[in-house]
């Protein structure tokens, strides 16, 4: 089984590309979705509540409040990552084990910080989703709860698009229309299944 590591900076179109892989019948593990689910389950909730008092509303993590804390405190960001990353990797391992048992030939790990965390060691091919900066920023700024400060913080934590592209086995440019993006995804699938 071949494992694709799908990555790219904020608002580059990773979710759209991941959906195109799914539509083509390829199983996708989303690190962001795993984190989102962890924010709703025990024991993660108790750990977050203990380490980050004041980020809970109605028994749930208020992601906006948590984000505001993390933007201003790198130590707290590292604390959260120490809680979340091992749990996400555990879910990723289960996903891969299940895919192998089911005889899948190709799977995708959608991991925003794949290269920053040296995750490329766990995959066979790295696919970087990329778009021009103006398009990236435009996409980011229409997101709910996004601000210039938050965009700069997130983008600053991530490896530059140029460096990511240099480390890619495949680059999917999402700066054009959706059909063009879909065709690029199908090309990647065909190329990897052929070898």
From Swiss-Prot:
GO CC terms of this entry: cytoplasm
Record-linked Pfam families: CoaE
Biological process according to GO: coenzyme A biosynthetic process
DPCK domain location: 3-195
Leading EC class: transferase
One Gene Ontology MF term: dephospho-CoA kinase activity
Function statement: Catalyzes the phosphorylation of the 3'-hydroxyl group of dephosphocoenzyme A to form coenzyme A.
Protein name, entry field: Dephospho-CoA kinase
Native species: Bartonella henselae (strain ATCC 49882 / DSM 28221 / CCUG 30454 / Houston 1) (Rochalimaea henselae)
Record lineage: Bacteria, Pseudomonadati, Pseudomonadota, Alphaproteobacteria, Hyphomicrobiales
